[in-house]
From Swiss-Prot:
Pfam families the UniProt entry points to: Presenilin
PANTHER family with a match to the protein in the record: PRESENILIN (PTHR10202), PRESENILIN-2 (PTHR10202:SF24)
Keyword Transmembrane: yes
Highest taxon in the source lineage: Eukaryota
Location in the cell: Endoplasmic reticulum membrane; Golgi apparatus membrane
Name by which UniProt lists this protein: Presenilin-2
Function per UniProt: Probable catalytic subunit of the gamma-secretase complex, an endoprotease complex that catalyzes the intramembrane cleavage of integral membrane proteins such as Notch receptors and APP (amyloid-beta precursor protein). Requires the other members of the gamma-secretase complex to have a protease activity. May play a role in intracellular signaling and gene expression or in linking chromatin to the nuclear membrane. May function in the cytoplasmic partitioning of proteins.
Family: Belongs to the peptidase A22A family.
Protein source organism: Homo sapiens (Human)
Record gene name: PSEN2
Cytoplasmic side: 1-87, 160-166, 222-223, 271-361, 410-413, 435-448
Length: 448
């Protein structure tokens, strides 16, 4: 699921523009001059309107703090073009890193390509000589897997709808504990074994403990944004590696196709579970749990920047380390550092509102299934690099098209259908057409 974070308030555009600037960027001219007093503000406004009438031009700063609701023509498009491309790139980087971690592990660590077990959600084996029976078993495994995903998603939405925040947090914390401690222990042990690196158990356990403890703090409490993003990428890669190892080959491809269809239905249907989850969060003005969503931008507020009270006109609270960064409390409510504005003369009762920085949110499930597709392409069959790179490029193309549609429709969209469809088409076409062609050229020593 792919969503776009944007400010809903149009009463004070000054906050939206300054929240996207650096901490040391100067305040716009209209903001500084318009707060001097009622007489100065009126004189400034009259002088500016006369100047604009004489020049025949429109001052864009007049819309910043003039109290006029709405934006000047073209400002919304300018902000979308300026900051939209940046966040697209910021989303490409983590997706690429997650897939690189998975492919590098598949190519180097044999543990994740050895088939010595299956998930309990895929009980039907594919070790049968009959193609029809193998296809039937893969379809049955897919039906069971998708049913489990649907039931758990609906269960999560019901819990969220009835505000069972503590239960959801406990559920997510237990999942994170298993990923950050158990799966990390297995992963690190296999990597050390592959590269023949000796390490005693106390050191290994201490390393896993430090890694997991820091991850739990960053994901479920507060920490640097970059560190939180790195942990979300890592747990997505670990989960993808588990699916690659324990999902049967044919079942994995059928599940990828089915999950993209389910994602389409769950997000776009009026009563789809993911759509209901997003709409409920928007109605309550609450963030979706950070353990489920990767965000290219956190909820940065004006209180986090190094403001100059003399130039900004703001009264900040004394420094408190616990309020340095925005975080989420134990009930999922946003917790912001407070910045108080003194009442502006000439604007009774008007206060600057904290705005959310524009950004793109991508569900961790999308990271996982992107990596499963690329990892399966690297692990199954010939494991040809051409096939792996083709799937990688297909996923990025699909993600780019999804982001383009997101900019057009400006609502939550499923991120799996286009990318997974392109990935499956590129995989089977490359594996069955391009790879034999390249092998034939290589056998005849012909190079293009």
């Amino acid at each position: 699921m792919l969503t776009f974070m944007a400010s809903d308030s149009e009463e004070e555009v000054c906050d939206e523009r300054t929240s996207l600037m650096s901490a040391e960027s100067p305040t716009p001219r209209s903001c500084q001059e318009g707060r001097q007093g009622p007489e100065d503000g009126e004189n400034t406004a009259q002088w500016r309107s006369q100047e604009n009438e004489e020049d025949g031009e429109e001052d864009p700063d007049r819309y910043v703090c003039s109290g006029v609701p709405g934006r000047p023509p073209g400002l919304e498009e300018e902000l979308t073009l300026k900051y939209g491309a940046k966040h697209v790139i910021m989303l490409f980087v983590p997706v690429t890193l997650c897939m690189i971690v998975v492919v590098a592990t598949i190519k180097s660590v044999r543990f994740y390509t050895e088939k010595n077990g299956q998930l309990i959600y895929t009980p039907f084996t594919e070790d049968t000589p009959s193609v029809g029976q193998r296809l039937l078993n893969s379809v049955l495994n897919t039906l069971i897997m998708i049913s489990v995903i649907v039931v758990m998603t609906i269960f999560l939405v019901v819990l969220y709808k009835y505000r069972c925040y503590k239960f959801i947090h406990g559920w997510l914390i237990m999942s994170s504990l298993m990923l950050l401690f158990l799966f990390t222990y297995i992963y690190l042990g296999e990597v050390l074994k592959t590269y023949n690196v000796a390490m005693d158990y106390p050191t290994l356990l201490l390393t896993v403990w430090n890694f997991g403890a820091v991850g739990m703090v960053c994901i479920h409490w507060k920490g640097p944004l970059v560190l939180q993003q790195a942990y979300l990428i890592m747990i997505s890669a670990l989960m993808a590696l588990v699916f690659i190892k324990y999902l049967p080959e044919w079942s994995a491809w059928v599940i990828l196709g089915a999950i993209s269809v389910y994602d389409l239905v769950a997000v776009l249907c009026p009563k789809g579970p993911l759509r209901m989850l997003v709409e409920t969060a928007q109605e309550r003005n609450e963030p979706i749990f950070p353990a489920l969503i990767y965000s290219s931008a956190m909820v940065w507020t004006v209180g986090m920047a190094k403001l100059d009270p003399s130039s900004q006109g703001a009264l900040q609270l004394p420094y408190d380390p616990e309020m340095e960064e925005d975080s989420y409390d134990s009930f999922g409510e946003p917790s912001y550092p407070e910045v108080f504005e003194p009442p502006l003369t000439g604007y009774p009762g008007e206060e600057l509102e904290e705005e959310e920085e524009r950004g793109v949110k991508l569900g961790l499930g999308d990271f996982i299934f992107y990596s499963v597709l690329v990892g399966k392409a690297a692990a199954t069959g010939s494991g040809d690099w051409n096939t792996t790179l083709a799937c990688f490029v297909a996923i990025l193309i699909g993600l780019c098209l999804t982001l383009l549609l997101l900019a057009v429709f400006k609502k939550a969209l499923p991120a799996l259908p286009i990318s997974i469809t392109f990935g499956l088409i590129f995989y089977f076409s490359t594996d069955n057409l391009v790879r034999p062609f390249m092998d034939t050229l290589a056998s005849h020593q012909l190079y293009i």
